[in-house]
């Protein structure tokens, strides 16, 4: 998630079994062995076309050189958010961890202590061009998983998380000024 190949990506594993399974998934479940005729192949499982182009690979490799700086910037952003919202009702989902690469910066907000609902806050921030998001909607609320028989479970912790969470902007090119704008907007609500 921290670097791009435009589309697609890479998986690493030290498991031979997992490696073989991933090869099947990426190429329509097809296998070609040396003992087969030149045109033959076998579809051993349902798979997908998860092969990326050489150009996408080149882009990904060039991004690897920037990965350390991307992660360092994300950590700076996380520290700034942590400091800004310390002693407020906006709580980071995780406390600062120097080992985290901060794909997301998720906060929990006790909306019972605000004069605004989660939906109103979300819309208001979006109207101010602040790209907040909600990560993630619980899977037992999704139609696909409901069709598989999930959804009736009692999940009070997940439900509470979903009621309180949203993600603040977190990406390496987020400027200090843009982050300050996000923080000031949230303090408008907190002081409101």
Positions of PLM-derived features:
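Exposed boundary/loop context
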Residues: 1-2, 40
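Glycine-rich phosphate-binding loop of ATP-grasp-fold ATP-dependent ligases
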Residues: 2, 6-11
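PLP-dependent aminotransferase class I/II
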Residues: 14-192
């Amino acid at each position: 998630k921290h670097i791009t190949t435009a589309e697609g990506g890479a998986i690493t594993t030290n498991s031979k079994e997992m490696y073989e399974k991933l090869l099947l998934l990426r190429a329509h479940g097809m296998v070609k062995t040396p003992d087969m005729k030149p045109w033959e192949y076998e579809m051993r499982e349902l798979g997908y076309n998860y092969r990326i182009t050489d150009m996408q690979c080149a882009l990904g490799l060039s991004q690897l050189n920037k990965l350390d700086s991307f992660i360092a910037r994300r950590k700076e952003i996380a520290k700034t958010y942590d400091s800004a919202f310390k002693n407020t009702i906006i709580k980071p989902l995780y406390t600062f961890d120097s080992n985290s690469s901060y794909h997301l910066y998720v906060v929990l907000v006790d909306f019972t202590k605000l004069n605004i609902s989660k939906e109103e806050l979300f819309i208001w921030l979006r109207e101010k061009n602040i790209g907040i998001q909600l990560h993630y909607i619980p899977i037992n609320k999704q139609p696909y998983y409901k069709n598989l028989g999930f959804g009736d479970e009692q999940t009070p912790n997940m439900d509470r998380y979903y009621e309180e969470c949203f993600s603040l902007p977190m990406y390496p090119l987020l400027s200090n000024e843009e982050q300050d704008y996000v923080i000031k907007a949230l303090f408008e609500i907190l002081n409101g």
